[in-house]
Amino acid sequence: MAETEIPTQLYLISPLDVRGGFPQRLERALEAGRGVVTAFQFRVKGIDQHEAARLAEPLQAICAAHDVAFVVNDSIALAKRLKADGVHLGQDDGSPKEAREQLGREAQIGVTCHASRHLAMEAGEAGADYVAFGAFFDSATKDKGDAEQPTLELLEWWSQVFEIPCVAIGGITPDNCQPLIEAGADFLAVSGAVWSGDERAAVQAFAEQIAAA
């Protein structure tokens, strides 16, 4: 991919619990991240689709008001029900082709590719709009298990060879994100670093690192 003037952007991932005051926290994070936060992933586990949709609706409205893409994790069916901007697929969540058939041409479809060049190329060939590599660091959100840890060289290779954007994920903080930005990550997917403390301050700290790159 040729050098681009578009800087690295933030891709916020929700905590598993989005009840209570989370909509207000999301609002504050997006206000602090204008021009930097461009996508939000709705990621909940262990609840039925009806409850997930109920929890998603106010968050989706907040994202729309801030011109931030609302992406559903794992579930093509929920993304279709919500008319979400996109869906993020793990390796066991269906194919980009299936998602495209269900969600239409305009949907943003992302695929988890761990540390695999092969999976990323397959995803691109299948019509993915972005590929996600990780976990780069220890993370409560992305359990690496025995998975191979991706390298900075993987990001560099992808960004130089392919036009499809790449997302770096897994344990990313303002303190460790600079090498990922320099290696060519188009997006930093972040969760714990934002929601475990002051979301405004965290987003602003990421924005400062991006601006300094």
UniProtKB/Swiss-Prot annotation:
Its EC number is 2.5.1.3. Keywords: Magnesium, Metal-binding, Thiamine biosynthesis, Transferase. 4-amino-2-methyl-5-(diphosphooxymethyl)pyrimidine binds at residues 41-45, 73, 112, 142. Its cofactor is Mg(2+). Pathway: Cofactor biosynthesis; thiamine diphosphate biosynthesis; thiamine phosphate from 4-amino-2-methyl-5-diphosphomethylpyrimidine and 4-methyl-5-(2-phosphoethyl)-thiazole: step 1/1. GO terms for molecular function: magnesium ion binding; thiamine-phosphate diphosphorylase activity. PANTHER family: THIAMINE-PHOSPHATE PYROPHOSPHORYLASE, THIAMINE-PHOSPHATE SYNTHASE. Condenses 4-methyl-5-(beta-hydroxyethyl)thiazole monophosphate (THZ-P) and 2-methyl-4-amino-5-hydroxymethyl pyrimidine pyrophosphate (HMP-PP) to form thiamine monophosphate (TMP). This is Thiamine-phosphate synthase. It comes from Erythrobacter litoralis (strain HTCC2594). The gene is thiE.
